[in-house]
């Protein structure tokens, strides 16, 4: 077990902003977090994180995964001060961090989100891992076995898709063609990703994805996404985080307030 205080970090806000599609929610502020071939249980009480790992694993794996090198208090403050209409977003999403995840997994997720929306994309990501990834079990200190799955590599995914007898679905067809291109045609995910992938994986924080935020930006800022992308925030990190502040707000509107103030 490793315990650390992390200000401006909130597990529930990160989960609800759809940044990390395959976290397993046990209850509010308690998650199984999967990364590559590792998984840990993390609980949060206020700013305290109780992590089911040793100190070495925290600094070698999870410190980078959670983007803890970045001062998110400064990121939040810069967004909040830029425009009064950002204040509600900044207050409600102040614990959101960008998460450093697997390249292939994020490429698939970004494409699914672009075509199907975040809710459906998260559901399908779980199904892909369950059907084609390596199955693992761990109690995580709960007393009960919890099953989780590694995200499959392109090699593993293509091998299992080729062994299936049914004709498949459009999603399976996309996955098969993508794996073949990566393995046999020198296909570069870095050069062919959409704006969401560029933000999630490449950390091209000058990008501002339009997935599911067009209507909200038009309504609240009286402009289209292309104009909104030109906002001159102090740092690129702020621009990337702002997208997830907006997405978090849309997906989880407070009961007492249905629009920005």
Give a label for each model feature:
Residues 1-261:
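HhH-family (HhH-GPD) DNA N-glycosylase catalytic core used in base-excision repair
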